[in-house]
Amino acid sequence: MSAIPAEESDQLLIRPLGAGQEVGRSCIILEFKGRKIMLDCGIHPGLEGMDALPYIDLIDPAEIDLLLISHFHLDHCGALPWFLQKTSFKGRTFMTHATKAIYRWLLSDYVKVSNISADDMLYTETDLEESMDKIETINFHEVKEVAGIKFWCYHAGHVLGAAMFMIEIAGVKLLYTGDFSRQEDRHLMAAEIPNIKPDILIIESTYGTHIHEKREEREARFCNTVHDIVNRGGRGLIPVFALGRAQELLLILDEYWQNHPELHDIPIYYASSLAKKCMAVYQTYVNAMNDKIRKQININNPFVFKHISNLKSMDHFDDIGPSVVMASPGMIQNGLSRELFESWCTDKRNGVIIAGYCVEGTLAKHIMSEPEEITTMSGQKLPLKMSVDYISFSAHTDYQQTSEFIRALKPPHVILVHGEQNEMARLKAALIREYEDNDEVHIEVHNPRNTEAVTLNFRGEKLAKVMGFLADKKPEQGQRVSGILVKRNFNYHILSPCDLSNYTDLAMSTVKQTQAIPYTGPFYLLYYQLQKLTGDVEELEIQEKPALKVFKSITVVQEPGMVVLEWLANPSNDMYADTVTTVILEVQSNPKIRKGAVQKVSKKLEMHVYSKRLEVMLQDIFGEDCVSVKDDSVLSVTVDGKTANINLETRAVECEEGSEDDESLREMVELAAQRLYEALTPVH
């Protein structure tokens, strides 16, 4: 049994190459109807070099039509420069404007602070720079189409520019949330709930069945913890990624310091090599934030802080007395946050606040279990005496937000990604429990491991739209409509051939047939024979040569020793041309037909020729407006209101009533008619 072509198959495959029962290196492959899409292309924060990549070796990058990046975090876009520059990928890549602006600086920082040899680096600063030219931008809610794949995006909350992508292939809709948050915070709007219900929902499961504490309570706990650390003369370290939650925490701290004058002498530093560039991006893209920020920008820019200074490196840091430092990266793997942590961890007055989600295998995750000692980057063992607090500002959905989002959309299939194995399993079980007694809503929940494919079947109806000329008139019941069926990507149209150039990129071609046939007989014999057969023969003159138009489509031109047929090739015209050819060959090859035909038509053809030429002659004498044909056997000449009629068969001329006394007109017409007849009559 022959395999079904991928484009005709009803099978849809979803395969995580990363973020399958793990957090990190998000990369989901979608295959349907011969199209392949990659959703995100991240790295694993807890791994290095090639080990941090998704399982790209399981696919052929050249087959990917479209790559969509949900947001700028490294676990969602960190492998993108490598994929665009080091593989055979030739498809198109899209992300939002804000994501592209921040991607450039965030990955530049990643390249600089990575603590691995140049040989193990996935890509260079040059690769990153060149990858920018291959990335296209999309506005929120803007519909685009690539290779028959329609897609658009919604606000996802989470971070500035984060997007959820709705993808439609052959009528099947899939929503990929990326990382999203349904809770509005100080600067970001909550994730939108699409008004279109998807058939498949690929959704993050980072927090599983956990419920977040209320925003107000969380902010108060955070501010109190920071206040306690500086009150005891300590230094507060808040490891964050340069962009994302950092801006939210800066807004909170700046407002808290403003309301507490006793803290004004204690400095807050935003320690990132990207600090200045990042804040410029945030100050630019305020229109992508929530209403509160957009209203405030009319008075002052909330991202121009009063109590926070930028700290580019440790060289510029005067580490004397209590202070608060927000430093990147967020999981304390390397960079400024790692330097400060190793410098401060032995003093019990100091404190570290973990404010975001931590991936397994990172130092941030390790210290949350409060070990007695830690290992420095140089391999030295240090006692951990500073306080460790975990206050999650991670803008991911909790169980309540996730379940409400699913309840609003009611997708038949839910695919869980971006969650640790146990958290994901608990979320899957909770969702199944929620809908097991609901007869109206049937939802299948899947939680595939990395490289494991989820296979779904979608059998869509094929509808063809009648367009253009064929759609001008409403068809009646039982009427047959015929045209050309045009398939473009996954859309079918029925068109008239004349509309092809209007509705498609197809060019219309015509084939002109020319056929020469030997013929030596009188040309008028062909006229007679074809007229007798078809009743549809028109006399023409082409380049001063006698010609006939038969069936309104076949042109017959007299040439010396032959006739030439011309027509536009199509099934009906070809059939007409065969008929005309048969008649010509029959007249040419059969002397009896020619002799009999001459006798039958000589008189008729003589009258025909005589009539035409007499009309021309009289027009030359009296003027074109004075001569008219009454019927096949009568010509009329009218001069100064007097009319003379000529009987072409008898050549008799009679004047109409009131014109009898004008003998001169009658005699003049009669003489002209007689002389022409004598000139045309052959001498035997």
UniProtKB/Swiss-Prot annotation:
Cross-linked sites for Glycyl lysine isopeptide (Lys-Gly) (interchain with G-Cter in SUMO): 462, 465, 545
Keyword Acetylation: yes
Subcellular location: Nucleus
Residues engaged in binding Zn(2+) 1: 71, 73, 158, 179
Cofactor note: Binds 2 Zn(2+) ions per subunit.
Post-translational modification: Sumoylated on Lys-462, Lys-465 and Lys-545, preferentially by SUMO3.
A Pfam family this chain is assigned to: CPSF73-100_C
Lineage: superkingdom: Eukaryota
Phosphoserine: residues carrying this PTM: 659
N-acetylserine found at: 2
EC number in record: 3.1.27.-
Enzyme type, top EC level: hydrolase
Keywords of this entry: Acetylation, Endonuclease, Hydrolase, Isopeptide bond, Metal-binding, mRNA processing, Nuclease, Nucleus, Phosphoprotein, Ribonucleoprotein, RNA-binding, Ubl conjugation, Zinc
GO cellular component annotations of the record: mRNA cleavage and polyadenylation specificity factor complex; ribonucleoprotein complex
Modification type Phosphothreonine: residues: 681
Active-site residues, record numbering mapped to chain: 396 (proton donor)
Cofactor names: Zn(2+)
Function comment: Component of the cleavage and polyadenylation specificity factor (CPSF) complex that plays a key role in pre-mRNA 3'-end formation, recognizing the AAUAAA signal sequence and interacting with poly(A) polymerase and other factors to bring about cleavage and poly(A) addition. Has endonuclease activity, and functions as an mRNA 3'-end-processing endonuclease. Also involved in the histone 3'-end pre-mRNA processing.
UniProt xrefs under PANTHER family: CLEAVAGE AND POLYADENYLATION SPECIFICITY FACTOR FAMILY MEMBER, CLEAVAGE AND POLYADENYLATION SPECIFICITY FACTOR SUBUNIT 3
The protein's assembly and partners: Component of the cleavage and polyadenylation specificity factor (CPSF) complex, composed of CPSF1, CPSF2, CPSF3, CPSF4 and FIP1L1. Interacts with CPSF2, CSTF2 and SYMPK. Interacts with TUT1; the interaction is direct and mediates the recruitment of the CPSF complex on the 3'UTR of pre-mRNAs. Interacts with WDR33. Interacts with ZC3H3. Interacts with ISY1; this interaction is in an RNA independent manner. Interacts with the microprocessor complex subunits DGCR8 and DROSHA; this interaction is in an RNA dependent manner.
Family: Belongs to the metallo-beta-lactamase superfamily. RNA-metabolizing metallo-beta-lactamase-like family. CPSF3 subfamily.
Protein name: Cleavage and polyadenylation specificity factor subunit 3
Species this chain originates from: Mus musculus
